Amino acid sequence: MNIPQRRSLGIVNTLSYQVALVTKSHRKRAEDLLSEIGLHAGQEMTLLALWDGSDVSQSELAARLGVQKATVTVALRSMEREGLVSREKDPDDQRVTRVRATPKFLALGEEVRNAWARLDSETTAGLSDDERKQLSTLLEKVADNLQGD
């Protein structure tokens, strides 16, 4: 992206700007690959969080995904309509809604794995094994920095 420096607020030469651009491109490519198997970006993370087949509360799912409860509620509504998850009130506490991946959703596991393998391959094309390892190490450090731990 070519933005004149005088109009860029001085941010276009920062690493954070580069990360933002890469993140945007990566998410777009993930959306494209997942749409080929009938999913939307983010739904694969829900599948991962529910992969063991057990049910969890919506609050626990939000915590696992690192998102707000309201975000999960909206996402689950459409996923339930698509037959990917089921939701039921907890019999011991009617205030709690339990979520479970349906067999239809769990059956997509291999296709999700393949889509992510393809995304990973495309993302790191042209990098040597050492560069991939170095990138992974650096991204872990950046993630740790942003998590504030």
Model-found features: residue ranges?
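N-terminal leader segment of winged-helix/HTH proteins
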Residues: 1-37
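Charged, amphipathic alpha-helical coiled-coil/dimerization segments
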Residues: 2, 27, 77-140, 144
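Pre-recognition alpha-helix immediately N-terminal to the DNA-recognition helix
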Residues: 18, 29, 45-48, 107, ...
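Short, locally clustered residues in the helix-turn-helix/winged-helix DNA-binding domain
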Residues: 20, 48-52, 140
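Short helix-coil-helix linker/hinge
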Residues: 37-43, 71, 102, 127-129
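Short capping segments at the starts of secondary-structure elements
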Residues: 53-57
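Residues within helix-turn-helix
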Residues: 58-59, 70, 77, 97
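Residues within the alpha-helical elements of helix-turn-helix
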Residues: 64
